[in-house]
A protein has these predicted regions:
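Rossmann-fold scaffold of SDR-type NAD(P)-dependent oxidoreductases
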Residues: 8, 118-130, 153, 205-208, ...
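N-terminal Rossmann NAD(P)H-binding glycine-rich loop of SDR-like oxidoreductase domains
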Residues: 11, 15-21
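Conserved internal alpha-helix within the Rossmann fold of NAD(P)-dependent oxidoreductases
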Residues: 156-161, 203, 317
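Conserved glycine-rich Rossmann-like NAD(P)H-binding loop of the short-chain dehydrogenase/reductase
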Residues: 25-71
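Conserved Rossmann-fold cofactor-binding substructure of NAD(P)-dependent oxidoreductases
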Residues: 94-120
Length: 361
């Protein structure tokens, strides 16, 4: 069955291959491109980025026209493939909080009637944006370079995830009364461009790395200090995020009668959406393997074994996500843990390799 995926960081390497394979399988894909300020002016959040050499519909509130980002040419090329009509491209720079907020509102607006998210569900979000500046030895690295690793590989993906998860709350019209204002002016009605239903995320995937494992410390990875530290911090952050999601979903689950009432009063609400009482999100961390990408194309001081292509990595990871993600036969790794005589904590994030093997935190 066709699904809706959101790939954050899709202009090259793993993210681009995710987008390509998902489109070929007939899925709907929302993909993001990060653009330097000097090559892309910020568009209206309600407008997707334009196709190459195409002038978008002008934003009546802004005279500025977004330009085609040259660093995303391979991503834009996918719009010309047989299923390219299923691709929506938005702007997001995970190292910039304003960009993250603008991107989140762009996603929210895709939930309005006629938008690709009008069903109120994103089946899978893949937070893939990342950076590797080599060498990144802790004993030699600059403050700026270390901070860049943390902002791009850790803080950005987690904050982006947090903002996207906030979409599970419906956007309500302004309150009809306010204790802080004596104005008698009527309340501004909800804009028809704003969605009235929440958007549920079923599975959230973070692209992690074996370098971030604190159990299997890889001391031979000279020059990976900053990168490894950023991935280790990402792992801890996403584990806490999963625990927080689980606690919140348990504390606010409405009664069955309340859920039925909501569905009756809002027929557009999906039965498995957050508002109907099932806002569980499965959180996964994935090590994609030693993938031959532009980011990994650096001269290392050690031999990397088992290098695989992006095509192989993504093909395998799609299988892992299908099995371990929301509704999978091994959702959250519960079944595989039981087979090993272990108990998987409910709602916990789990860490997997592209081969579907459990990896230690």
């Amino acid at each position: 069955m066709p699904q809706t995926w959101l790939i954050v960081g899709a202009t090259r390497g793993i993210g681009l291959e995710f987008t390509s394979q998902l489109l070929s399988l007939g899925h709907t894909v929302i993909a993001t491109a990060r653009s330097p300020t000097h090559s892309l002016l910020t568009p209206s959040p309600s407008l997707p980025l334009p196709l190459p050499n195409q002038t978008p519909n002008p934003d009546p509130h802004s005279p500025r026209t977004p330009k085609f980002p040259s660093n995303a040419s391979n991503l834009w090329a996918l719009t010309g493939t047989p299923n390219g009509h299923n691709l929506t491209i938005l702007e997001c720079d995970v190292s910039d909080e304003k960009s993250i907020k603008s991107f989140t509102e762009s996603v929210r607006k895709l939930g309005r009637k006629g938008g690709v998210l009008e069903g109120g569900v994103i089946d899978v979000v893949v937070l893939n944006a990342g950076v590797l500046e080599y060498p990144g030895r802790v004993s030699e690295i600059s403050f700026t370079s270390f901070a860049h690793h943390l902002h791009t590989n850790t803080i950005g993906p987690l904050i982006t995830a947090s903002h996207l998860l906030s979409l599970s709350s419906p956007l309500l019209p302004p309150s009809s009364s306010s204790s802080t204002s004596s104005s008698t002016q009527p309340t501004t009605p909800l804009s028809p461009l704003q969605p009235t239903i929440p958007i549920q995320i079923k599975t959230m995937v973070f692209t992690s790395s074996d370098s971030g494992s604190t159990t299997n410390f890889r001391s031979f990875e000279d020059g990976f200090g900053a990168y490894a530290a950023s991935k280790a911090a990402l792992n801890q952050g996403l584990r806490h995020l999963a625990a927080e999601i689980h606690r919140k979903s348990r504390s606010k689950a409405p009664s069955t009668s309340a859920s039925i009432s909501n569905l009756i009063t809002n027929p557009n609400l999906q039965p498995n959406s957050a508002e109907s009482g099932n806002d569980k999100t499965v959180v996964l961390a994935l090590h994609p393997g030693e993938v031959s990408t532009d980011m990994a194309n650096v001269a290392l001081d050690w031999e990397v074994e088992g290098i695989i292509s992006p095509q192989e990595s993504i093909s395998c990871m799609l299988k892992v996500i299908r099995e371990k993600g929301y509704g999978g036969q091994d959702e959250g790794g519960v079944v595989s843990a039981r087979s090993e005589g272990k108990r998987e904590e409910e709602g916990a994030a789990t860490f997997w390799t592209w081969e579907g093997k459990r990896y230690p935190w």
